Amino acid sequence: MKTLCLLFAVLCLVTWTQARGAEVEENLTAQDGEVDIAGDNGDVQLTLNTDDFESFTLKTLTLGHPRVKRHSCVCRRICAARQVRKGRCSRRRRICCLY
């Protein structure tokens, strides 16, 4: 019975973790104007740990175009209509990327 309860608890934890995947934040620092996200599944919201770069290149495969490996991003208060909100910059601005 204990094994069954433990198995059920693990299953619930895995399901809960997957459901919260869209809320996961990843803190990154831009280096040479580029941010590299190797394992981004598209649900990660980023927090950029720098105020130095007003614009940068986001290296990921998951902003809607699987063949595009780099996206041009900027830190703005409001994202334009053709931009995807990918997180926030450290000055209460959003990371807005062209898709």
Swiss-Prot record:
Biological processes annotated in GO: defense response to bacterium
Annotated S-S bridges: C73-C97, C75-C89, C79-C96
GO cellular component: extracellular region
Expression sites by tissue: Lowly expressed in spleen, and expressed at lower levels in kidney and lung.
Signal sequence annotation: 1-21
Described function: Has antimicrobial activity.
Family: Belongs to the alpha-defensin family.
Name this polypeptide is given: Defensin-A4
Source organism: Ornithorhynchus anatinus
Lineage start: Eukaryota, Metazoa, Chordata, Craniata, Vertebrata
